[in-house]
Protein backbone atom coordinates (compact mmCIF):
# COMPACT_ATOMS: atom_id res chain seq x y z
CA UNK A 1 0.00 0.00 0.00
CA UNK A 2 3.04 2.30 0.29
CA UNK A 3 6.41 1.96 -1.40
CA UNK A 4 9.38 4.19 -0.49
CA UNK A 5 13.10 3.82 0.00
CA UNK A 6 13.70 3.95 3.75
CA UNK A 7 16.49 6.37 4.76
CA UNK A 8 17.65 3.78 7.31
CA UNK A 9 17.17 0.02 7.05
CA UNK A 10 17.80 -1.52 10.44
CA UNK A 11 14.89 -3.96 10.77
CA UNK A 12 11.78 -5.53 9.29
CA UNK A 13 8.68 -5.01 11.45
CA UNK A 14 5.47 -7.03 11.42
CA UNK A 15 2.75 -4.99 13.10
CA UNK A 16 0.39 -7.73 14.32
CA UNK A 17 -3.02 -6.10 14.70
CA UNK A 18 -5.65 -8.59 13.47
CA UNK A 19 -4.08 -12.04 13.08
CA UNK A 20 -2.87 -12.76 16.63
CA UNK A 21 -1.18 -16.11 16.09
CA UNK A 22 2.26 -17.56 15.50
CA UNK A 23 1.16 -20.44 13.27
CA UNK A 24 -0.47 -20.32 9.81
CA UNK A 25 0.05 -16.57 9.53
CA UNK A 26 0.81 -15.31 6.01
CA UNK A 27 1.79 -11.81 7.15
CA UNK A 28 4.26 -13.19 9.68
CA UNK A 29 5.74 -15.59 7.14
CA UNK A 30 6.05 -12.86 4.49
CA UNK A 31 7.73 -10.45 6.89
CA UNK A 32 10.15 -13.15 8.07
CA UNK A 33 11.04 -13.94 4.47
CA UNK A 34 11.80 -10.27 3.76
CA UNK A 35 13.93 -9.99 6.91
CA UNK A 36 15.89 -13.06 5.88
CA UNK A 37 16.41 -11.74 2.34
CA UNK A 38 17.77 -8.44 3.67
CA UNK A 39 19.65 -10.06 6.59
CA UNK A 40 17.90 -7.64 8.92
CA UNK A 41 16.65 -8.06 12.50
CA UNK A 42 12.98 -9.01 12.67
CA UNK A 43 10.42 -7.90 15.23
CA UNK A 44 6.72 -8.45 15.86
CA UNK A 45 5.09 -5.24 17.09
CA UNK A 46 1.85 -5.28 19.08
CA UNK A 47 -0.35 -2.55 20.53
CA UNK A 48 -3.56 -3.37 22.38
CA UNK A 49 -5.11 -0.03 21.41
CA UNK A 50 -4.26 -0.60 17.74
CA UNK A 51 -5.65 -4.15 17.78
CA UNK A 52 -8.89 -3.21 19.50
CA UNK A 53 -10.16 0.22 18.38
CA UNK A 54 -13.83 0.62 19.39
CA UNK A 55 -13.67 -2.64 21.38
CA UNK A 56 -15.17 -3.09 24.84
CA UNK A 57 -13.31 -4.10 27.99
CA UNK A 58 -14.56 -7.68 27.54
CA UNK A 59 -12.99 -7.98 24.09
CA UNK A 60 -9.74 -6.26 25.10
CA UNK A 61 -9.41 -8.58 28.11
CA UNK A 62 -9.98 -11.67 25.98
CA UNK A 63 -7.23 -10.66 23.57
CA UNK A 64 -4.90 -9.56 26.35
CA UNK A 65 -5.24 -12.85 28.23
CA UNK A 66 -3.92 -14.72 25.21
CA UNK A 67 -0.85 -12.51 24.72
CA UNK A 68 1.57 -14.27 27.07
CA UNK A 69 1.04 -17.54 25.21
CA UNK A 70 1.53 -15.76 21.88
CA UNK A 71 4.68 -14.01 23.11
CA UNK A 72 6.18 -17.29 24.36
CA UNK A 73 5.37 -19.05 21.10
CA UNK A 74 7.04 -16.34 19.02
CA UNK A 75 10.10 -16.17 21.27
CA UNK A 76 10.42 -19.95 21.10
CA UNK A 77 10.93 -19.44 17.37
CA UNK A 78 13.50 -16.71 17.94
CA UNK A 79 11.09 -13.87 17.14
CA UNK A 80 11.34 -10.73 19.28
CA UNK A 81 7.95 -9.46 20.52
CA UNK A 82 7.59 -5.73 21.22
CA UNK A 83 4.59 -4.35 23.08
CA UNK A 84 3.89 -0.66 22.47
CA UNK A 85 1.73 0.81 25.22
CA UNK A 86 0.34 3.67 23.12
CA UNK A 87 -3.10 5.17 22.61
CA UNK A 88 -2.92 6.80 19.17
CA UNK A 89 -1.66 5.85 15.69
CA UNK A 90 0.70 8.85 15.77
CA UNK A 91 2.34 7.47 18.93
CA UNK A 92 2.64 4.04 17.34
CA UNK A 93 4.25 5.57 14.24
CA UNK A 94 6.88 7.18 16.47
CA UNK A 95 7.69 3.80 18.03
CA UNK A 96 8.00 2.30 14.56
CA UNK A 97 10.32 5.07 13.43
CA UNK A 98 12.60 4.28 16.39
CA UNK A 99 13.13 0.83 14.84
CA UNK A 100 14.22 2.34 11.48
CA UNK A 101 12.45 -0.36 9.48
CA UNK A 102 13.25 -1.21 5.90
CA UNK A 103 9.70 -2.57 5.66
CA UNK A 104 6.52 -2.54 7.75
CA UNK A 105 4.17 -5.50 7.21
CA UNK A 106 0.70 -5.59 8.74
CA UNK A 107 -2.67 -7.34 8.62
CA UNK A 108 -5.71 -6.59 6.48
CA UNK A 109 -8.90 -5.24 8.02
CA UNK A 110 -12.07 -4.08 6.29
CA UNK A 111 -13.25 -1.96 9.23
CA UNK A 112 -13.04 1.83 9.36
CA UNK A 113 -11.25 2.28 12.72
CA UNK A 114 -8.53 -0.24 11.84
CA UNK A 115 -8.12 1.24 8.36
CA UNK A 116 -7.79 4.72 9.88
CA UNK A 117 -5.03 3.47 12.19
CA UNK A 118 -3.17 1.96 9.25
CA UNK A 119 -3.64 5.03 7.08
CA UNK A 120 -2.23 7.29 9.81
CA UNK A 121 0.68 5.01 10.68
CA UNK A 122 1.60 4.59 7.01
CA UNK A 123 1.51 8.37 6.49
CA UNK A 124 3.90 9.01 9.39
CA UNK A 125 6.39 6.19 8.81
CA UNK A 126 9.42 6.45 6.54
CA UNK A 127 9.41 3.01 4.96
CA UNK A 128 7.42 0.81 2.60
CA UNK A 129 4.21 -0.63 4.05
CA UNK A 130 2.65 -3.92 2.94
CA UNK A 131 -0.80 -5.13 4.01
CA UNK A 132 -1.31 -8.91 3.92
CA UNK A 133 -4.81 -10.43 3.90
CA UNK A 134 -4.62 -13.29 6.38
CA UNK A 135 -8.31 -13.11 7.28
CA UNK A 136 -9.76 -14.43 4.04
CA UNK A 137 -8.91 -17.69 2.30
CA UNK A 138 -9.20 -15.92 -1.05
CA UNK A 139 -7.89 -12.36 -0.50
CA UNK A 140 -10.60 -9.72 -0.57
CA UNK A 141 -9.05 -7.66 -3.35
CA UNK A 142 -8.53 -10.74 -5.51
CA UNK A 143 -12.19 -11.75 -5.33
CA UNK A 144 -13.87 -8.52 -6.37
CA UNK A 145 -13.34 -4.80 -6.88
CA UNK A 146 -16.86 -3.80 -5.79
CA UNK A 147 -19.55 -4.50 -3.22
CA UNK A 148 -21.16 -7.83 -4.06
CA UNK A 149 -24.95 -8.00 -4.15
CA UNK A 150 -25.40 -11.34 -2.39
CA UNK A 151 -23.83 -14.71 -1.65
CA UNK A 152 -24.91 -15.96 -5.08
CA UNK A 153 -22.79 -13.29 -6.81
CA UNK A 154 -19.62 -13.73 -4.76
CA UNK A 155 -19.76 -17.54 -4.43
CA UNK A 156 -18.65 -18.40 -8.00
CA UNK A 157 -15.86 -15.82 -7.82
CA UNK A 158 -14.50 -17.38 -4.63
CA UNK A 159 -14.89 -20.95 -5.89
CA UNK A 160 -13.02 -20.14 -9.11
CA UNK A 161 -9.99 -18.95 -7.14
CA UNK A 162 -10.14 -21.28 -4.15
CA UNK A 163 -7.70 -23.86 -5.47
CA UNK A 164 -5.16 -21.15 -6.32
CA UNK A 165 -5.08 -19.78 -2.77
CA UNK A 166 -5.91 -22.87 -0.71
CA UNK A 167 -2.30 -23.99 -0.36
CA UNK A 168 -0.50 -25.55 2.63
CA UNK A 169 1.23 -23.21 5.06
CA UNK A 170 5.01 -23.39 5.40
CA UNK A 171 6.02 -24.24 8.95
CA UNK A 172 7.42 -21.47 11.12
CA UNK A 173 11.06 -22.42 11.61
CA UNK A 174 13.30 -21.02 14.31
CA UNK A 175 14.83 -17.69 13.33
CA UNK A 176 18.61 -17.90 13.32
CA UNK A 177 20.69 -14.74 13.65
CA UNK A 178 19.48 -11.22 12.90
CA UNK A 179 18.29 -10.88 16.51
CA UNK A 180 16.29 -7.74 17.23
CA UNK A 181 16.52 -5.77 20.46
CA UNK A 182 14.12 -2.87 20.92
CA UNK A 183 12.41 -1.44 23.97
CA UNK A 184 9.17 -3.24 24.86
CA UNK A 185 6.62 -1.94 27.34
CA UNK A 186 5.36 -4.39 29.97
CA UNK A 187 2.08 -6.07 29.06
CA UNK A 188 -0.53 -4.13 31.02
CA UNK A 189 -4.06 -5.45 31.43
CA UNK A 190 -6.87 -3.21 30.15
CA UNK A 191 -8.84 -1.31 32.78
CA UNK A 192 -12.35 -2.43 33.65
CA UNK A 193 -15.23 -0.04 34.17
CA UNK A 194 -14.98 2.03 30.98
CA UNK A 195 -18.13 0.34 29.64
CA UNK A 196 -20.85 -1.99 30.85
CA UNK A 197 -19.10 -5.23 29.90
CA UNK A 198 -17.25 -7.59 32.22
CA UNK A 199 -14.78 -10.36 31.49
CA UNK A 200 -16.29 -13.80 30.83
CA UNK A 201 -14.92 -17.27 31.50
CA UNK A 202 -16.98 -19.03 28.81
CA UNK A 203 -14.06 -18.97 26.35
CA UNK A 204 -10.36 -19.50 27.00
CA UNK A 205 -8.26 -17.23 24.74
CA UNK A 206 -5.22 -18.14 22.67
CA UNK A 207 -4.03 -20.30 19.80
CA UNK A 208 -3.93 -23.51 21.82
CA UNK A 209 -7.52 -23.10 23.00
CA UNK A 210 -8.65 -22.27 19.45
CA UNK A 211 -7.09 -25.45 18.08
CA UNK A 212 -8.66 -27.50 20.88
CA UNK A 213 -12.13 -26.07 20.19
CA UNK A 214 -11.76 -26.79 16.48
CA UNK A 215 -10.61 -30.34 17.19
CA UNK A 216 -13.56 -30.90 19.53
CA UNK A 217 -15.96 -29.56 16.91
CA UNK A 218 -14.65 -31.94 14.24
CA UNK A 219 -14.66 -34.97 16.55
CA UNK A 220 -17.90 -34.39 18.43
CA UNK A 221 -20.15 -31.78 16.81
CA UNK A 222 -19.74 -31.43 13.06
CA UNK A 223 -21.92 -34.52 12.44
CA UNK A 224 -24.93 -32.54 13.69
CA UNK A 225 -23.96 -29.25 12.03
CA UNK A 226 -27.02 -29.43 9.78
CA UNK A 227 -29.01 -28.78 12.99
CA UNK A 228 -27.03 -25.59 13.66
CA UNK A 229 -30.20 -23.44 13.58
CA UNK A 230 -31.56 -25.20 16.67
CA UNK A 231 -30.26 -23.30 19.74
CA UNK A 232 -31.03 -26.25 22.00
CA UNK A 233 -28.43 -28.38 20.18
CA UNK A 234 -24.68 -28.07 20.76
CA UNK A 235 -23.91 -28.06 17.03
CA UNK A 236 -21.94 -24.84 16.49
CA UNK A 237 -18.16 -24.65 16.20
CA UNK A 238 -17.87 -21.73 18.67
CA UNK A 239 -14.83 -20.54 16.73
CA UNK A 240 -16.05 -17.01 16.00
CA UNK A 241 -14.22 -15.28 18.90
CA UNK A 242 -10.98 -16.95 17.82
CA UNK A 243 -11.48 -16.17 14.15
CA UNK A 244 -12.33 -12.58 15.04
CA UNK A 245 -9.03 -12.07 16.88
CA UNK A 246 -7.06 -14.18 14.42
CA UNK A 247 -6.15 -16.80 17.04
CA UNK A 248 -6.81 -19.44 14.40
CA UNK A 249 -6.61 -19.26 10.61
CA UNK A 250 -9.74 -19.77 8.51
CA UNK A 251 -7.52 -21.28 5.84
CA UNK A 252 -6.12 -23.83 8.32
CA UNK A 253 -9.67 -24.81 9.27
CA UNK A 254 -10.62 -25.28 5.61
CA UNK A 255 -7.51 -27.34 4.83
CA UNK A 256 -8.03 -29.64 7.81
CA UNK A 257 -11.75 -29.98 7.18
CA UNK A 258 -11.28 -30.93 3.53
CA UNK A 259 -8.67 -33.54 4.44
CA UNK A 260 -10.89 -35.16 7.09
CA UNK A 261 -12.69 -38.12 5.51
CA UNK A 262 -14.79 -38.75 8.63
CA UNK A 263 -16.82 -35.55 8.28
CA UNK A 264 -20.12 -36.03 6.39
CA UNK A 265 -19.94 -34.37 2.98
CA UNK A 266 -23.12 -32.31 3.42
CA UNK A 267 -22.07 -31.02 6.85
CA UNK A 268 -18.66 -30.17 5.44
CA UNK A 269 -20.16 -28.24 2.52
CA UNK A 270 -22.53 -26.24 4.73
CA UNK A 271 -19.82 -25.41 7.25
CA UNK A 272 -17.38 -24.26 4.56
CA UNK A 273 -20.12 -22.16 2.95
CA UNK A 274 -20.46 -20.29 6.25
CA UNK A 275 -16.73 -20.05 6.94
CA UNK A 276 -15.58 -19.03 3.47
CA UNK A 277 -18.39 -17.63 1.30
CA UNK A 278 -20.53 -15.93 3.96
CA UNK A 279 -17.59 -14.67 5.98
CA UNK A 280 -15.82 -13.27 2.93
CA UNK A 281 -19.09 -11.73 1.71
CA UNK A 282 -19.27 -9.86 5.04
CA UNK A 283 -15.69 -8.64 4.65
CA UNK A 284 -16.46 -7.50 1.10
CA UNK A 285 -19.52 -5.59 2.32
CA UNK A 286 -17.68 -3.69 5.06
CA UNK A 287 -14.67 -2.93 2.85
CA UNK A 288 -16.65 -1.50 -0.06
CA UNK A 289 -19.51 0.12 1.89
CA UNK A 290 -18.27 2.76 4.36
CA UNK A 291 -21.80 3.07 5.77
CA UNK A 292 -21.85 -0.55 7.00
CA UNK A 293 -22.77 0.60 10.53
CA UNK A 294 -25.72 2.84 9.60
CA UNK A 295 -29.02 2.50 7.68
CA UNK A 296 -27.36 4.21 4.72
CA UNK A 297 -25.90 0.81 3.87
CA UNK A 298 -29.33 -0.74 3.27
CA UNK A 299 -30.26 -1.49 -0.37
CA UNK A 300 -32.62 1.01 -1.98
CA UNK A 301 -35.64 -1.31 -1.83
CA UNK A 302 -35.17 -1.73 1.94
CA UNK A 303 -34.64 1.98 2.57
CA UNK A 304 -37.86 2.76 0.67
CA UNK A 305 -39.99 0.14 2.39
CA UNK A 306 -38.74 1.05 5.87
CA UNK A 307 -39.40 4.73 5.13
CA UNK A 308 -42.93 3.87 3.99
CA UNK A 309 -43.61 2.09 7.30
CA UNK A 310 -41.64 4.49 9.49
CA UNK A 311 -44.75 5.89 11.19
CA UNK A 312 -46.42 2.50 11.75
CA UNK A 313 -47.56 2.14 15.38
CA UNK A 314 -45.36 -0.09 17.57
CA UNK A 315 -47.08 -2.23 20.20
CA UNK A 316 -43.88 -2.16 22.26
CA UNK A 317 -41.08 0.41 22.31
CA UNK A 318 -38.11 -0.25 24.61
CA UNK A 319 -35.21 1.88 25.74
CA UNK A 320 -31.61 0.82 25.25
CA UNK A 321 -31.40 0.11 28.99
CA UNK A 322 -34.41 -2.22 28.84
CA UNK A 323 -32.89 -4.07 25.90
CA UNK A 324 -29.52 -4.25 27.63
CA UNK A 325 -31.05 -5.77 30.77
CA UNK A 326 -33.10 -8.29 28.78
CA UNK A 327 -36.26 -6.73 30.16
CA UNK A 328 -38.85 -7.07 27.38
CA UNK A 329 -42.22 -8.86 27.20
CA UNK A 330 -40.61 -11.63 25.07
CA UNK A 331 -38.94 -14.36 27.14
CA UNK A 332 -37.18 -15.78 24.07
CA UNK A 333 -35.60 -12.42 23.20
CA UNK A 334 -34.64 -11.88 26.84
CA UNK A 335 -32.89 -15.26 26.94
CA UNK A 336 -30.88 -14.39 23.83
CA UNK A 337 -29.78 -11.12 25.44
CA UNK A 338 -28.84 -12.92 28.67
CA UNK A 339 -26.80 -15.38 26.65
CA UNK A 340 -24.93 -12.48 25.03
CA UNK A 341 -24.29 -10.63 28.30
CA UNK A 342 -23.34 -13.61 30.45
CA UNK A 343 -21.58 -15.89 27.97
CA UNK A 344 -20.08 -13.39 25.51
CA UNK A 345 -21.67 -15.02 22.47
CA UNK A 346 -25.20 -15.52 21.18
CA UNK A 347 -26.38 -18.51 19.17
CA UNK A 348 -26.31 -17.75 15.44
CA UNK A 349 -30.01 -18.34 14.81
CA UNK A 350 -30.96 -16.22 17.79
CA UNK A 351 -28.83 -13.32 16.51
CA UNK A 352 -31.23 -12.96 13.58
CA UNK A 353 -34.36 -13.09 15.75
CA UNK A 354 -32.76 -10.75 18.31
CA UNK A 355 -31.86 -8.04 15.78
CA UNK A 356 -35.19 -8.20 13.93
CA UNK A 357 -37.11 -7.76 17.17
CA UNK A 358 -35.02 -4.70 18.00
CA UNK A 359 -36.30 -3.21 14.73
CA UNK A 360 -39.87 -4.10 15.69
CA UNK A 361 -39.59 -2.59 19.18
CA UNK A 362 -37.78 0.69 18.49
CA UNK A 363 -39.15 3.96 17.14
CA UNK A 364 -36.95 4.08 14.03
CA UNK A 365 -34.58 1.89 11.98
CA UNK A 366 -31.80 4.29 13.03
CA UNK A 367 -32.42 3.50 16.70
CA UNK A 368 -32.61 -0.21 15.91
CA UNK A 369 -29.29 -0.19 14.10
CA UNK A 370 -27.62 1.85 16.83
CA UNK A 371 -28.92 -0.33 19.67
CA UNK A 372 -28.09 -3.63 17.98
CA UNK A 373 -24.55 -2.55 17.11
CA UNK A 374 -23.94 -1.16 20.59
CA UNK A 375 -25.12 -4.34 22.31
CA UNK A 376 -23.21 -6.66 19.99
CA UNK A 377 -20.02 -4.60 20.06
CA UNK A 378 -20.14 -4.27 23.85
CA UNK A 379 -20.97 -7.81 24.92
CA UNK A 380 -20.02 -10.22 22.14
CA UNK A 381 -16.45 -11.52 22.09
CA UNK A 382 -16.72 -11.52 18.30
CA UNK A 383 -18.14 -7.99 18.20
CA UNK A 384 -16.61 -5.11 16.23
CA UNK A 385 -16.35 -7.52 13.31
CA UNK A 386 -17.45 -7.52 9.67
CA UNK A 387 -19.68 -10.54 10.34
CA UNK A 388 -21.49 -8.70 13.12
CA UNK A 389 -22.10 -5.50 11.17
CA UNK A 390 -23.26 -7.46 8.14
CA UNK A 391 -25.55 -9.64 10.24
CA UNK A 392 -27.21 -6.60 11.79
CA UNK A 393 -27.58 -4.95 8.37
CA UNK A 394 -29.10 -8.17 6.97
CA UNK A 395 -31.57 -8.48 9.84
CA UNK A 396 -32.69 -4.85 10.03
CA UNK A 397 -32.09 -3.59 6.49
CA UNK A 398 -32.23 -6.52 4.08
CA UNK A 399 -28.56 -6.40 3.06
CA UNK A 400 -27.74 -9.47 0.91
CA UNK A 401 -31.43 -10.44 1.09
CA UNK A 402 -34.52 -9.84 -1.08
CA UNK A 403 -37.98 -8.33 -0.53
CA UNK A 404 -40.58 -10.54 1.22
CA UNK A 405 -44.32 -10.20 1.87
CA UNK A 406 -45.16 -6.70 3.08
CA UNK A 407 -46.22 -6.18 6.68
CA UNK A 408 -46.32 -3.45 9.32
CA UNK A 409 -43.03 -1.86 10.50
CA UNK A 410 -40.85 -4.25 8.46
CA UNK A 411 -42.36 -3.45 5.09
CA UNK A 412 -40.85 -6.05 2.77
CA UNK A 413 -37.81 -6.76 4.98
CA UNK A 414 -37.78 -10.42 6.06
CA UNK A 415 -39.82 -11.00 9.23
CA UNK A 416 -39.28 -13.44 12.11
CA UNK A 417 -41.54 -14.11 15.07
CA UNK A 418 -41.96 -16.19 18.22
CA UNK A 419 -44.38 -18.63 16.57
CA UNK A 420 -41.86 -19.33 13.82
CA UNK A 421 -39.17 -20.00 16.40
CA UNK A 422 -41.49 -22.42 18.24
CA UNK A 423 -41.97 -24.38 15.02
CA UNK A 424 -38.20 -24.57 14.55
CA UNK A 425 -37.01 -25.65 18.01
CA UNK A 426 -38.08 -26.17 21.63
CA UNK A 427 -38.20 -22.57 22.73
CA UNK A 428 -38.86 -23.38 26.40
CA UNK A 429 -35.81 -25.65 26.55
CA UNK A 430 -33.57 -22.88 25.21
CA UNK A 431 -35.00 -20.28 27.60
CA UNK A 432 -34.59 -22.60 30.59
CA UNK A 433 -31.03 -23.49 29.60
CA UNK A 434 -29.96 -19.85 29.29
CA UNK A 435 -31.80 -18.80 32.46
CA UNK A 436 -29.96 -21.44 34.48
CA UNK A 437 -26.59 -20.63 32.92
CA UNK A 438 -26.99 -16.90 33.58
CA UNK A 439 -28.51 -17.21 37.05
CA UNK A 440 -31.83 -15.67 36.02
CA UNK A 441 -35.16 -16.44 37.63
CA UNK A 442 -37.98 -17.16 35.22
CA UNK A 443 -41.22 -15.35 35.98
Regions found by a protein language model. Name each.
Residues 140, 146-301, 424-443:
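Glycine/tryptophan-enriched, flexible segments
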Residues 61-68, 90-94, 119, 148, ...:
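Generic alpha-helical secondary structure signal
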Residues 18, 232-431, 436-437:
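Active-site-proximal binding-pocket segments
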Residues 1-169, 173, 338, 360-362, ...:
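Trp/Phe/Arg-rich N-terminal binding region typifying the photolyase-homology
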Residues 1-5, 57-63, 199, 207-210, ...:
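Short low-complexity stretches enriched in small and charged residues
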Residues 27, 66, 70, 210-217, ...:
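Alpha-helical packing segments of well-folded alpha/beta enzyme cores
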Amino acid sequence: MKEVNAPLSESVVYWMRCEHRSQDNWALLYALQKADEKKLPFVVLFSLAASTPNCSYRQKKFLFDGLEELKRSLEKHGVFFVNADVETPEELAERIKEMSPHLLVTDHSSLKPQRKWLETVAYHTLCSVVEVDGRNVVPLRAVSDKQEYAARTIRPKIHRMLEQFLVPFPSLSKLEGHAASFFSDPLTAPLAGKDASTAVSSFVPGEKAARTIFSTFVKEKVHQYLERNDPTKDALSNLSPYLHFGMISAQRIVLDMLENKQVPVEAKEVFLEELVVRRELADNFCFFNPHYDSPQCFPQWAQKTLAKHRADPREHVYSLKEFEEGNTHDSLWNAAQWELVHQGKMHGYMRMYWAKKILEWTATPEDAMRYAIYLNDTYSLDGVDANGYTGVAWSIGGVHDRPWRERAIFGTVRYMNYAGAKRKFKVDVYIQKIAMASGRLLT
